[in-house]
């Protein structure tokens, strides 16, 4: 009998894919991670990025099981757990210093850096753009084989594939015809670095954690981050998926885009001077840091609430590939890390069950029912959180969003 070393692939090197690779490595299980992007440089990973608050039962549990708890703790501190809620007139309606349960904030880049540095470099294949994923039965062995076709690399065959390739997942096409759908909102992202020294008044406005100014179905939200930064999200509610084209924002810098946002009566023309100053400064600073670059403004997508697929042997999805949702429940990365945690346990359990001497077909027979249960559990909790997130989106991006968000926090 051949010695078992199941051929496991993880498609996607985001938080869920990297965490799954690290969790399997901790258990002595080999998996290859294929990632579209080139390996990020230290300079790129040091840049300000969105902040992620990790929850005890999911993100924090994954950090502990990855053996990264101390390193994770050392990477915190850029953003506090404090919250400020303002209305468009600039009136503060709610402040707090975080809930009873700690939910520490880490930047997306810091989390990525932590996972990359603790995963053996030979397990991650960078610059691998996937063309297609196929499934077929090997008539000789009886095992299901998953074939991955790349644009510029040799085709590879695996016994099990976890699709962690995000919103526009190629892997998902093998399992589900459902494409992401437009959520009804557009997002502009801009960053102010060294805010405390360069713009102390804006630093005070935003506080040390998260600030949300909401109303008239739009929002300005900020998070503090690396390099004493303020990361601004200008969120515009519109049924027009092609809004950036409709209003002529394509191929414009953030400094140019700000005029549309600040001059429109339906957007931010009548907001408080301090909030308009925040938006203008963030757009100007973004263009100063990235001269000539197009503004980062785009539609926000989600998978249909309750998205699921018929189970197939040898392949599954995790993270945004499985359950892309809007960010209004703060659960996206936490669910992704929870998926990685549970799937790693399932793969390890199948490994223990069949022992060292088994072929791929026997391993898949042991694994398959466990993956079915994993998928049912994952999709059930994801559906609940996706529904919550979509409900919050409609609540917070309403005419009186600030009042409704303040009430939400006061009742938590």
Positions of predicted regions on the chain:
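Eukaryotic N-terminal low-complexity, Ser/Thr- and Lys/Arg-rich leader segments
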Residues: 1-8, 19-28, 121, 138-150, ...
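Conserved N-terminal helical subregion
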Residues: 2-8, 23-25, 49-195, 243
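A structural signal for isolated positions on well-ordered beta-strands in alpha/beta enzyme cores
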Residues: 9, 32, 231-233
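Conserved mid-domain beta->alpha element of the FAD-binding
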Residues: 9-30, 37, 162-163, 188, ...
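A short beta-to-alpha transition loop/helix N-cap that caps and shapes the active-site region
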Residues: 40-44
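Short, solvent-exposed loop/turn segments at secondary-structure boundaries
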Residues: 46-47, 175-176, 246, 329-332
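Conserved FAD/dinucleotide-binding core of flavoprotein oxidoreductases
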Residues: 94-97, 102, 107, 112, ...
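Histidine-centered metal-chelating micro-motifs
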Residues: 168-169, 189, 218-221, 322-323
């Amino acid at each position: 009998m051949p010695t078992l070393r199941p051929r496991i692939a993880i498609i996607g090197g985001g938080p869920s894919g990297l965490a799954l690779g690290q969790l399997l490595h901790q258990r002595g299980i080999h998996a290859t991670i294929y990632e579209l992007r080139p390996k990020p440089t230290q300079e790129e990973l040091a840049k300000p990025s969105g902040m992620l608050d990790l929850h005890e039962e999911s993100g924090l549990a994954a950090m502990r099981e990855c053996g990264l708890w101390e390193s994770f703790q050392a990477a915190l501190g850029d953003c506090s757990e404090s919250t400020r809620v303002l209305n468009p007139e600039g009136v503060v309606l709610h402040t707090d210093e975080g809930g009873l349960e700690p939910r520490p904030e880490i930047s997306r880049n810091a989390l990525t850096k932590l996972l990359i540095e603790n995963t053996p470099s030979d397990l991650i294949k960078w610059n691998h753009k996937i063309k297609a994923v196929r499934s077929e039965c090997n008539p000789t062995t009886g095992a299901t084989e998953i074939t991955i076709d790349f644009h510029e690399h040799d085709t590879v065959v695996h016994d099990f594939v976890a699709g962690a390739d995000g919103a526009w997942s190629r892997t998902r096409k093998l399992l589900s015809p459902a494409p992401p759908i437009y959520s009804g909102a557009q997002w502009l992202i801009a960053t102010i670095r060294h805010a405390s020294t360069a713009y102390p008044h804006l630093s005070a406005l935003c506080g040390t954690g998260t600030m949300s100014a909401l109303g008239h179905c739009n929002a300005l939200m900020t998070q503090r981050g690396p390099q004493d930064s303020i990361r601004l999200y200008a969120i515009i509610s519109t049924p027009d998926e092609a809004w950036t084209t409709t209003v002529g924002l394509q191929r414009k810098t953030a400094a140019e885009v700000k005029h549309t946002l600040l001059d429109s009566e339906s957007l931010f023309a009548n907001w408080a001077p301090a909030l308009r100053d925040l938006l203008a400064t963030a757009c100007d600073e973004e263009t100063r840091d990235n001269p000539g670059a197009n503004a980062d403004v785009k539609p926000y997508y989600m998978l249909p609430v309750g998205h699921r697929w018929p189970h197939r042997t040898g392949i599954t999805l995790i993270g945004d590939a499985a359950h892309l949702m809007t960010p209004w429940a703060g659960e996206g990365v936490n669910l992704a890390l929870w998926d990685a945690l549970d799937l790693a346990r399932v793969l390890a359990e199948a490994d223990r069950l069949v022992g060292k001497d088994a072929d791929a077909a026997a391993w898949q027979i042991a694994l398959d029912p466990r993956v079915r249960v994993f998928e049912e559990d994952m999709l059930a909790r994801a559906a609940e959180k996706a529904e919550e997130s979509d409900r919050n989106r409609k609540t917070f991006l309403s005419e009186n969003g600030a009042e409704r968000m303040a009430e939400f926090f006061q009742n938590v």
